[in-house]
Amino acid sequence: ERGEEYIVGQKAHTYQYEGGGAAALGSIHPQPLTFESDGTLDLEKVAAVIKPDDFHFPPTRLLCLENTHRGQALSLDYLYAVQQFVSEKNLKLHLDGARIFNASVELNIHAKKIAKHFDSVSFCLSKGLGAPVGSILCGSKNLITHARRWRKTLGGGMRQAGIIAAAGLYALQNNIERLSEDHKNAQLLAKGLNEIEQLTIDPKSVQTNMVFVDAHKIDCQELTSFLKSNGVLIQGSGLLRLVTHLDIREKDITTAVKAFKAYFN
């Protein structure tokens, strides 16, 4: 509710890349924390920022996690620990599961074994699943009834949306298992780029479909132009995020790695 607080990762998408929507539209106060290297939030640090029952502070009500975060899947052991933690602290638990199916494929489990730990879960039908558009919010009947009202209030109602739903259903029925192909291609990309001395990359950190490349020591604008002239499109500077997906094949990985190597040679 208005004036209450949620705890969230400093680099979480819901905190950093949604135009301040939680504050602007929800009037709720974020308490950001730094992610650990494995994409988790340290529960001791979370406990330390939960506000006391004092009118000087916003009441802490919610903990938000992201899975995957930077391509890393949260372990089930961690999720069990978090579930016990929020129960003890009387907090609700939300998952930004935009790529929850990448996490489930990496962990070799059904997505419901991840989702069951949370009070609410959102996930994308696009991104890895390949639908043209759409996201889903999951939760209790009461939560979804409340969310639908807010969606309408904010102008989110749609007409003749069945064609979008059809694409989403196809993605859920056909495109989950194939996510392992994206993960394999990301590993190939990481291995190839790791052979380039001027780039810094940790192949062991590549669990799903994201490869992060430290390119702070090079001219990224020049690199981007060169790669574009060789049929490879990237964006960003300093830290490059390369994402494999439905439209990327192994031959495309080979093309990309060759283009990167040609630039540095």
Language model features with spans:
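Conserved PLP-enzyme active-site core in the AAT-like
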Residues: 1-203, 207-217, 221-248, 256-264
